[in-house]
């Protein structure tokens, strides 16, 4: 019998060339297309409740939407979700919004986080494909409100890149954040966000980018025609939306015209669903994400 946390995928469309797997007992190989010539291929990675909630405004540090949506840490489904996220961090580099960085003071966007089980095979899988040991950690921040002592900025071997605006660059300087690479552009406009990702590709060699949110960042990328696909884990938790302020929902994928490429679950008794949605090209405005970056 194989590993009970290995997701069994059903493929509806060809996703791209197979990347391979660090351990076939734990992970099925996933495929990715070649990235566009002038920017990274960007895929979102999120967890949502059974009724589509991805986040809400926290009352305090203990009011963690992701932990509540995921449920018991010992469930096989939750372990499978964590392992999928870690696998997706081996594909290329990883990005996250400044709000998430502020809310998670121990977060490091690496295949093995400090509290994880040891997983040297994930790093060997990266290195064998010509990638650096750790993925580059990319932070999106409109205003430069990044904690200077956050481990993304201070962990040896992790190369942080902050994507920000002119105002954000000034705030980073005020906070004496000097060791991170910085890309500056007009991120509140789709064209500025597009230019920033062109620079990620041209100046830093970012070919594949896993964006772990939050939803405001993902929506901005989508509006700028940059978000190519989404990996969505849906749990069995139903969130009472009336009990929270500032509730954020995931995309309505059908309304967005997205195509379901793959769907997975644990067999025989898994309750989470793991879906992979691919977008068509989109356009729009990124202005509404300004308050959280």
Regions of interest found by a model, annotated:
Residues 1-293:
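Enzymes that bind and transform nitrogen-containing heteroaromatic metabolites
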């Amino acid at each position: 019998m194989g590993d009970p946390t290995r997701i069994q995928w059903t493929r509806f469309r060809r996703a791209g060339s197979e990347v391979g797997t660090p351990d076939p007992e734990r992970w099925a190989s996933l495929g990715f297309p070649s990235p566009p010539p002038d920017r990274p291929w960007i895929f979102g990675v999120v967890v949502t409740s059974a009724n589509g909630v991805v986040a809400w405004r926290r009352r305090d540090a203990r009011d963690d939407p992701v932990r509540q949506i995921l449920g018991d840490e010992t469930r096989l489904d939750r372990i499978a979700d964590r392992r999928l996220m870690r696998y997706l961090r081996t594909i290329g580099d990883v990005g996250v919004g400044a709000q998430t960085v502020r809310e998670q003071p121990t977060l490091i966007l690496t295949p093995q986080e400090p509290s994880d089980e040891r997983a040297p095979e994930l790093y060997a899988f990266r290195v064998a494909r010509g990638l650096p040991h750790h993925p580059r950690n990319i932070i999106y921040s409109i205003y430069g409100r990044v904690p200077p002592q956050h481990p993304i900025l201070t962990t040896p071997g992790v190369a942080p890149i902050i994507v920000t605006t002119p105002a954000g660059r000034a705030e980073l300087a005020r906070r004496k954040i000097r060791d991170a690479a910085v890309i500056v552009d007009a991120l509140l406009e789709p064209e500025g966000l597009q230019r920033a990702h062109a620079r990620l590709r041209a100046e830093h060699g970012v070919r594949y980018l896993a964006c772990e949110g939050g939803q405001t960042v993902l929506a901005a990328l989508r509006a700028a025609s940059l978000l190519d696909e989404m990996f969505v884990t849906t749990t069995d938790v139903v969130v009472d939306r009336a009990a929270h302020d500032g509730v954020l929902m995931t995309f309505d994928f059908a309304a967005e015209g997205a195509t379901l490429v793959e769907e997975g679950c644990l067999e025989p008794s898994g309750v989470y669903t793991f879906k992979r949605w691919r977008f068509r090209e989109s356009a729009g405005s990124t202005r509404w994400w300004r308050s959280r970056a």
